[in-house]
Regions:
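Conserved N-terminal glycine-rich FAD pyrophosphate-binding loop of Rossmann-like flavoproteins
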Residues: 4-6, 56-80
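Conserved FAD-binding subdomain of flavin-dependent enzymes
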Residues: 43, 73-94
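Glycine-rich Rossmann-fold phosphate-binding loop(s) that bind the pyrophosphate
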Residues: 32-36
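Glycine-rich beta-alpha-beta "Rossmann" dinucleotide-binding loop(s) and their flanking helix/strand
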Residues: 154, 170-198
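Extreme N-terminal leader/targeting segments of oxidoreductases
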Residues: 1-28, 143-144, 192, 197-201, ...
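Glycine-rich FAD pyrophosphate-binding loop
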Residues: 29, 45-65
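A conserved FAD-binding loop/helix module that cradles the flavin
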Residues: 229-257
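Feature captures the FAD/FMN-dependent oxidoreductase FAD-binding
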Residues: 88-163, 167, 173
Length: 258
């Protein structure tokens, strides 16, 4: 069979175009396809929600790929093992309450299962603003990451979502944008994004699940973003809290949409 280069191009453009149009109005839009964001998306999709994710980088997975200092092993605690088991990620006991998993297997497996659950992931797209109606966040303003990097003057497009989840990690990008540009008050003690604190694994893992919740009308936070918004510590290369955080937000949104 002779291959037609133009037909290959047409197939890619038509398929992506249709996928993007379908993503312009969804139940939940998640910014950041790290472990917390993907876990949140997976459990929402399993509940029948229409979910789309936007990841500014070429690859998904956030900082999980590199484990600790590029040693591609990651640690989970006992209470997160059930999530690993559900995804089919192999883990092994290091000592009581400390489980190890291969970081590459973990990211690739979670990503695969998330997409197969029905989630659409768009990489190389950044959220540069939020859409607000009646003091509630109800969508995202999107542009290619390459436009931002090249500092080109190119207008973005907008999509609508019943709920938006900020899973952008340490930067808490969506929450900071909402605070800075809209004047929406965050549900923190200061009404603002407080910024993450220095390393303390135990406290960070305990607070990350507690802090994963609605931070402004229509906007939820999960993963390291939650601790950045609420001023809690970072936790380093232990990832149980990330998965538990994403699952919690998925359940809260599902309960709200019932």
């Amino acid at each position: 069979m002779q291959l037609d280069e133009v037909k290959i191009s047409k197939a890619i453009i038509e398929s992506y175009n249709n996928k993007l149009i379908d993503a312009l109005n969804v139940d939940v839009a998640i910014v950041g396809a790290g472990p917390a964001g993907m876990c949140c998306a997976y459990y929402l999709a399993k509940q029948g929600k229409k979910v789309v994710m936007f990841e500014r980088k070429l690859s998904v997975g956030g900082g999980m790929w590199g484990g600790g200092i590029m040693f591609n092993e990651i640690v989970f605690q006992e209470k997160a093992k059930t999530i690993l088991d559900e995804f089919g990620v192999r883990s092994r006991l290091y000592e009581k309450n400390y489980y190890l998993a291969d970081s590459l297997e973990t990211v690739s497996t979670i990503c695969s299962k998330t997409i197969k659950a029905g989630v659409k992931i768009f990489n190389l797209i950044s959220a540069e603003d939020v859409m607000i109606r009646k003091n509630r966040i109800c969508g995202l303003v999107l542009n290619w990451t390459a436009v931002e990097i090249a500092n080109l003057h190119v207008d973005p497009i907008t999509m609508a979502a019943d709920f938006v989840v900020d899973a952008t990690g340490h930067a808490a990008e969506v929450a900071r944008i909402a605070e800075r540009k809209s004047g929406i008050s965050m549900k923190t003690s200061t009404g603002k994004v407080k910024g993450e604190r220095s390393m303390w694994a135990e406290a960070g893992e305990d607070t990350i699940v507690k802090n994963s919740k609605e931070v402004a009308p229509g906007l939820y936070v999960c993963g390291m973003c939650a601790n950045a918004v609420y001023g809690a510590p970072r936790m380093g290369p232990i990832f149980g809290g990330m998965l538990l955080s994403g699952k919690k937000v998925a359940q809260e949104i599902s309960n709200k949409q019932k």
